[in-house]
Structure formats: structure tokens, C-alpha cells
């Protein structure tokens, strides 16, 4: 008598570890970007009762560094292509290296070292975002990361938190340092939501209509918060973003009709774009008084003109090498040799990233940054045609640059510097020809 044994094969569901890790990485990037808006960090640590102390500054710096280190490690593991390093990304890293080297001749070397290291770290974090995520993913991450601080700020205003509203001029600050710290997250959230809505309308995937409605609601929320901040800096930067987006959208339509070749894009259209941007900048500064009167004098530089004059005079003192990154404003002689120095002796920056770059790195540092910006634009011309929202690269770059004329946004530990680096460096789905 024989015994028959039947074996039943049971398939155990596989645990998709890679998928889970990807979502963990998404969560990490959202948290990192939210931290680099600086509002949450300022609110948490300044509530510790150590406001104004050296311990508080060290704690805040350590917090920013801690949340960016995983990005640097992941970038090191994934690497950067030789094509990127031999192009504008290499020049951008050269700019950060120059500012780091400026510590050697800085007039306030200890401060310059900390500032230049943080500049480099945040640049690497921006490269990590560009290297690791597609344009669609980047836009989604930027959008989601901006919302927590904005929602908490809205809650803070509604519940009368201390410092959430400037009652003298009735503008909102929320959990941020000031209105020009509160407005950029609202502006980026608004722009990222708009770019995502653009992609949905163009692609029309499943559920595109309800998703577009949700994005529209987010845009209205962020725009409302931006308006309540009364920040003319971010509103003006958004205006330039829209102009740049419209310019490249028009070019995109003309190019699709085969009226413009790739060579013409590089040799004619791109120089024309740069000329228009320079012309608009010149008009803005030349006729600023008329613009102010048009806006009923609600736009003003809040005393920044004097800061810029000090910065320009300081640049002329050391035009080639500069004073060292963020070193000038921490040098006593920088004030005492100039008229009205006592009025701004407590200031530690120029209220203009353009002036900060000239002061910190001189002509060499400024030249490296300008070269990186121009070269990145030339390399990314193909995106205008190949990506559904390829206009984002140029529009986001000039959005940050426009805002940086009024605030020190080219600085370490700030999401605007990370955004600029990511926009200039591209995205994971790029297939950009070598220029």
C-alpha cells in the first residue's frame, strides 16, 4: 500500500522594500525643505528662552546641518555625472569653493567659515534634489513642503500668537522671522501648485479635473497668505516668474511649428531673452520712483538703499577678492570708515544677495555665479520643448534672482538657495545635450 502526498505551493507576498524606502525619502525631503524655510526652526528654538544667545545660534545651525547631511550622503552615493561637473554644475561648485577659500583672507574668518560651509552644504542638498527626482516629483515635494509652515502660520494668526501679526502695519508674519521670510514659502507654494496644474491640464491623466481643483484651492490659500504678508519683494518676483514662463511658452509654441532650430535657440532666442531680462532690470531701477508712485508709495526699500550704498562702497574697497563670505558686515572697520555707520552698525547682511556676493567674493565670486547661471540656461534650452513644464527651469531661476535683489537669499541653510541650485542643475529625467 503506497501513500500519496500532495504538496501545495504557497506564494508569500513580497515586501516591496524599495517602494517603502522611496516614500521614506519623499518624507525626508519634505521635512528638510520645511526646515530650510527657517520659520519652524526659529519658532521652536526661540521658544526655548535662549533668544539672542550664542547657544541659540549654534543650535539653529546644528539643526539645519543635521537635516541636510542625509542629502549630502545620498548625493555622494548616487554621484554626479561627468557631463554635469564639466558644465554649469561644476562652475556652481567652483563658486561655493571660492567662497569657502575666501575664509583665508576674510576680515572675520570665523563667521565666514561657518557661512561658507553652510552655503556649500545647501548647494549639495540642491544638487541631491536635482539628481534624485524628476521635475514632476520636485514640484510636488516643493509644494507639499511649503504647506505645514503656512498652515501653522495661518493658525497662529487666527489664534493671536505673539509676533504672528505686525499690528503697526497690519501685515502677517506667522511663525517666521518677518514678512519677507513668510512670503517666499507662500510664493513657492503658489508657483509649484500652478506648475503642477499646468502639467495636469496638458497631460490630462486620470482624475486630472479634481486634482486641478485641489491645486487651485492650494494656490488661492497660498496667494491669500502672500497678499496678507504685504511683501512686495515676493509679489514682484512672482510677476517676473509669470513673464519668463510666458516668454518660453511662446517660444515653445513657435518651436513646435519648426520655425526655430536648435542653433537659433542658442544663438538668437537665448541672447534675446537675456537682453530682455537685463532691460527689465534696468527699467526697474531707473524708474523706481515712478513705480512707487504707481503703487501709491506702498513699495519701498525700507532703508535698504543705505545698506546697498555701504555694500557697494565696500566692494570698491576690495573689488577682486572681496572681504570673505559674509565677513564685511561683521568687520568693525567696514562701518567706521563710512558716513552714517552708526545707523546700521547692528546689520549683518546687505539685504541683497547680489551685494552679498560682490562683497564676499569680489569680481571672481560674482563672475563664477553669473557664468553658472548663463551656462545653465544655455544647457537647459531643450527642456522648454521636451518637458511639459520645461519653462519652470528659467522661471524658477529668475524668480529666486529677482527676490535676491531685495533679500539675502543666496545663503546657506535657506530653501531659496536650494531652489536656485536645483533649477540650474536640472532633474533626473533630463536628457539635455552638451553645450
Residue ranges and their predicted role:
Residues 2-76, 97-105, 400-402:
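N-terminal signal-anchor transmembrane segment
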Residues 131, 269, 360-401:
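Hydrophobic transmembrane alpha-helices and their immediate junctions
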Residues 68-80, 97-154, 402:
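Transmembrane alpha-helical segments and their membrane-water interfaces
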Residues 293-309, 317, 321-361:
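Long extracytoplasmic/lumenal interhelical loops at the membrane interface
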Residues 31-33, 213-220, 348, 352, ...:
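Loop-to-helix entry and N-terminal half of a specific, functionally important transmembrane alpha helix
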Residues 191, 238-246, 393-435:
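Transmembrane alpha-helices of multi-pass inner-membrane enzymes
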Residues 68-72, 96-101, 137-167, 176-252, ...:
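Alpha-helical transmembrane segments of multi-pass inner-membrane proteins
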Residues 223, 231, 312, 319, ...:
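A conserved mid-to-late transmembrane alpha helix and its immediate loop/hinge
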Amino acid at each position: 500500500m503506497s501513500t500519496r502526498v500532495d504538496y501545495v505551493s504557497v506564494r508569500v507576498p513580497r515586501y516591496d522594500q524599495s517602494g517603502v524606502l522611496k516614500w521614506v525619502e519623499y518624507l525626508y525631503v519634505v521635512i528638510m525643505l520645511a526646515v530650510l524655510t527657517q520659520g519652524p526652526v526659529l519658532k521652536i528654538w526661540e521658544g526655548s528662552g535662549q533668544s539672542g544667545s550664542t547657544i541659540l545660534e549654534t543650535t539653529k545651525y546644528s539643526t539645519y546641518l543635521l537635516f541636510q547631511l542625509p542629502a549630502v550622503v545620498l548625493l555622494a552615493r548616487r554621484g554626479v555625472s561627468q557631463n554635469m561637473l564639466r558644465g554649469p554644475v561644476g562652475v556652481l561648485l567652483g563658486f561655493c569653493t571660492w567662497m569657502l577659500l575666501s575664509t583665508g583672507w576674510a576680515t572675520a574668518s570665523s563667521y565666514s567659515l561657518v557661512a561658507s560651509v553652510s552655503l556649500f552644504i545647501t548647494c549639495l542638498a540642491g544638487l541631491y534634489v536635482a539628481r534624485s527626482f524628476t521635475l514632476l516629483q520636485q514640484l510636488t515635494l516643493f509644494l507639499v513642503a511649503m504647506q505645514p509652515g503656512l498652515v501653522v502660520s495661518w493658525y497662529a494668526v487666527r489664534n493671536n500668537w505673539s509676533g504672528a501679526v505686525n499690528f503697526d502695519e497690519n501685515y502677517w508674519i506667522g511663525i517666521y522671522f518677518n514678512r519677507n521670510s513668510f512670503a517666499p514659502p507662500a510664493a513657492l507654494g503658489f508657483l509649484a501648485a500652478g506648475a503642477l496644474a499646468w502639467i495636469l491640464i496638458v497631460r490630462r491623466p486620470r482624475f486630472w479635473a479634481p486634482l486641478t481643483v485641489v491645486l487651485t484651492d492650494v494656490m488661492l490659500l497660498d496667494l491669500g497668505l502672500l497678499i496678507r504678508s504685504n511683501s512686495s519683494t515676493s509679489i514682484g518676483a512672482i510677476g517676473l516668474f509669470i513673464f519668463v514662463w510666458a516668454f518660453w511658452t511662446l517660444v515653445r509654441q513657435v518651436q513646435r511649428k519648426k520655425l526655430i532650430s536648435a542653433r537659433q535657440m542658442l544663438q538668437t532666442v537665448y541672447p534675446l531673452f537675456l537682453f530682455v531680462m537685463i532691460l527689465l532690470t534696468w527699467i526697474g531701477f531707473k524708474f523706481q520712483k515712478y513705480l512707487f508712485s504707481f503703487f501709491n508709495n506702498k513699495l519701498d526699500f525700507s532703508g535698504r538703499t543705505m545698506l546697498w550704498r555701504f555694500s557697494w562702497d565696500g566692494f570698491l574697497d576690495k573689488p577682486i577678492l572681496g572681504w570673505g563670505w559674509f565677513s564685511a558686515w561683521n568687520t568693525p572697520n567696514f562701518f567706521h570708515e563710512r558716513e552714517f555707520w552708526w545707523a546700521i552698525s547692528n546689520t549683518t547682511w546687505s539685504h541683497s544677495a547680489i551685494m552679498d556676493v560682490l562683497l564676499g567674493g569680489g569680481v571672481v565670486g560674482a563672475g563664477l555665479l553669473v557664468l553658472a547661471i548663463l551656462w545653465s540656461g544655455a544647457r537647459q534650452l531643450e527642456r522648454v520643448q521636451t518637458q511639459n513644464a520645461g519653462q519652470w527651469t528659467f522661471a524658477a531661476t529668475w524668480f529666486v534672482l529677482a527676490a535676491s535683489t531685495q533679500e539675502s537669499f543666496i545663503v546657506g541653510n535657506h530653501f531659496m538657495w536650494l531652489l536656485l541650485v536645483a533649477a540650474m542643475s536640472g532633474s533626473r529625467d533630463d536628457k539635455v545635450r552638451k553645450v
